[in-house]
């Protein structure tokens, strides 16, 4: 699928601050099984050409490698899963560094199938790069790795 060079217009409240855009990113992918996500909202958060980069290997969990996706590639990857499974992801800790119009956020997350599940089925860390164009924040890329037995989340990220 060809990559769009133009992102849809965003709700100004979603992109007015780093807090707002991170919240919108988590909210846009969360919902019950079978519920259509607001992909317009999701796309509106990302700078044209942005990348979403999960680190892992479904076949071999110990052979980690980045899987570089554009926004539409990410949506195509997760839609079948979201059709069958509830997915609620929320941020549980954050470290932010900013210089001028660029920012880096370490965002620790946990995922549940239902919002009231007592324990998450997954946790991990997102490395999020952001850019402010003078009027709004954009996500340039999100690069993440799930926690596993070999790679527990360090205390400094909790």
Annotated model-derived regions:
Residues 25, 42, 50, 105, ...:
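Hydrophobic pocket/interface hotspot
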Residues 1-45, 158:
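Short, low-complexity N-terminal intrinsically disordered segments enriched in polar/charged residues
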Residues 29, 46, 109-111, 143-146:
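Short beta-strand segments enriched in hydrophobic/aromatic residues
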Residues 8, 89-93, 125:
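Short structured motifs
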Residues 103, 114-120, 153-154, 158:
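Extended, well-structured beta-strand/loop surface patches
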Residues 2, 116, 123-153:
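Short beta-strand edge/turn micro-motifs at domain boundaries
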Residues 51-52, 56-116:
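Surface-exposed, charged secondary-structure patches
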């Amino acid at each position: 699928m060809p990559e769009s060079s133009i992102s849809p217009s965003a709700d100004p409240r979603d992109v007015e601050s780093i807090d707002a855009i991170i919240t919108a990113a988590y909210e846009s992918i969360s919902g019950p099984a079978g519920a259509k996500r607001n992909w317009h909202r999701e796309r509106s958060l990302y700078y044209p050409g942005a990348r979403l980069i999960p680190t892992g290997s479904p076949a071999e969990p110990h052979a980690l490698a980045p899987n570089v996706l554009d926004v539409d590639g990410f949506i195509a990857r997760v839609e079948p899963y979201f059709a069958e499974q509830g997915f609620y992801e929320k941020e549980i800790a954050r470290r932010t560094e900013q210089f001028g119009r660029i920012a880096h956020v370490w965002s620790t997350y946990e995922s549940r199938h239902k919002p009231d599940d007592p324990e998450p089925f997954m946790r991990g860390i997102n490395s999020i790069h952001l850019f402010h164009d003078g009027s709004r924040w954009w996500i340039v890329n999100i690069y993440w790795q799930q926690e596993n037995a070999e790679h527990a989340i360090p205390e400094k990220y909790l």
